[in-house]
Amino acid sequence: IIVSLVGSEMCIRDRIKWLLPLLLGYTGGKMVYGHRGGVIGAVTTAAAIVGTETFQFLGAMLVGPGSAWILKKVDGALQDSVPEGFEMLYDNFSLGILGLGTSVVTYLGLAPILTAISDGLGNFASGLVESGLVPLADIPIEVAKVLFLNNAVNHGVLTPLGAAESAEMGKSIYFMLEANPGPGLGLLLAYWFAGSGMWKASAPGSIIIHFFGGIHEVYFPYVLAHPIMIIAMWAGGISADLWFVATDAGLVGPASPGSIFAFLSMTPRGGAVGVLGGVAIGAIASAVVGTLLLRARPIQETDAGVEDEISTSIPGVDV
């Protein structure tokens, strides 16, 4: 049994170190330049993994799309001049040579930079943990989220920190800092209770998509349209994080997408009170503060152009 448990832990660690970054690198490259972009993205990501000791989610998000973009530009410049019948030869050799080049540059040039960034973030996070100031991290996290940088923050920064801590402690609070669905739920409840117009009408549908589907992006327009509501998000996030710290709560792995179901699936045995309590507290705090803000400063719907533009980001809304 002990051998199987150790083997399982090593398997999980290897998947976090190799499989997940490679998938990120391939997916990022494929989004830029199809299958060829995905292949060179994965190859270059492997160089980032080999060149560092830390989990390279951030590196994969950078070098995957970056190397695919380089290949796309090279193909655009050279493919028209390839003689007929030599297309396959060009495809294979160009990808291989460019993949070697981007891998060498990543290994020798970018790997030390990525290591320095990871070490800096790790030291910063350790300082927050030791000083008990982890909840304050929610302030920049929420701002980054509503600017649609949530995936970069979660997978590029928090997931590697959480993976390292989880490998040592069996769970980590870092997996919950960005992915907690509680504050977003509270914000949408506030709009449902105290909002008006399309914001009030669309809130129930957005709640289902956000809380159960884990698509946090659905509530970002609600903050961008009324920026003072970021205070409600801070209230919910900081309150939840204080509870997580007080109860020593954590998840065993990343909850992605940030759905309540993903949270439950990653909750360690005996840790449901800490995890679910933080979700509930975050939702209540965000809902109360958000309702007060909407009562004090109601959202204005006078700019039809802005309203039309934002409504396209909210499911089930026709203006």
Describe each model-derived feature in a short phrase.
Residues S4, L22-K30, T45-A48, G64-L71, ...:
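Hydrophobic core segments of alpha-helical transmembrane domains in multi-pass membrane transport
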